[in-house]
């Protein structure tokens, strides 16, 4: 979305590289944004083709098709061998149980067989919740769980409705830099 452009601008101004877990969008604007991410040194990683839980987790063949689809899309678009992935709903989700997958380890085994490493977040700004948080509240949601030391993967979204996430980003960056944190992407 246009929010992605603003996020990329903020990251560039702060000389920060990030990881973007991609949902397949094959329109020209989305492809240009994904190429910009990659060209500016960010890690482009797999998320899902559809983000529709009933489709992704219908059964193991459907899950494999989703993973293969997003991998092929990223690999072919960027000319890379994408090896990083984030589960729709996270790897500890129980959403898959409502559909055809009985054990998330079946999915993990498939990723392992493809040489794909999955990542989860350990802090969220809570922008995926139904509540509409202000930019300051989103930043506070992150800062509440940041300790004095540690490695954190912060979950934030760039969908069109996530304007407050964009507006919270500089607050989060400034606060974490003041605490001595550095930023890096998954590599």
Question: Where does each model-flagged region fall?
Answer:
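Proline-centered helix-kink/hinge sites
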Residues: 87-88, 170
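C-terminal domain-boundary segment and adjacent tail
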Residues: 9-15, 26-29, 161-187
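Structured helix-beta-strand junction loops
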Residues: 14, 40-41, 114, 148-149, ...
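Short, internal active-site loops enriched in acidic
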Residues: 89-93, 160
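Alpha-helical scaffold elements lining the catalytic groove of polysaccharide deacetylases
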Residues: 52-78, 93-151, 164-167
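Active-site beta->alpha N-cap acidic-glycine motif
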Residues: 1-82, 175
């Amino acid at each position: 979305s246009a929010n992605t452009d603003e996020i990329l601008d903020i990251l560039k101004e702060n000389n920060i590289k990030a990881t973007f877990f991609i949902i397949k969008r094959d329109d020209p604007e989305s492809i240009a944004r994904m190429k910009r991410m990659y060209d500016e040194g960010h890690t482009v990683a797999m998320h899902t083709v559809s983000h529709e839980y009933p489709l992704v987790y219908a059964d193991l063949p459907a899950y494999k098709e989703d993973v293969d689809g997003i991998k092929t899309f990223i690999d072919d678009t960027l000319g890379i061998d994408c090896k990083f992935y984030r589960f729709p709903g996270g790897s500890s989700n129980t959403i898959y149980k409502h559909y055809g997958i009985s054990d998330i380890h079946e999915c993990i085994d498939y990723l392992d067989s493809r040489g794909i490493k999955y990542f989860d977040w350990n802090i969220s700004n809570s922008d995926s919740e139904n509540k509409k948080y202000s930019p300051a509240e989103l930043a506070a949601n992150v800062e509440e769980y940041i300790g004095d030391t540690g490695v954190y993967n912060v979950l934030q979204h760039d969908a069109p409705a996530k304007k407050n996430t964009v507006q919270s980003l500089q607050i989060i960056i400034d606060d974490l830099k003041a605490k001595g944190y550095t930023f890096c992407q998954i590599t």
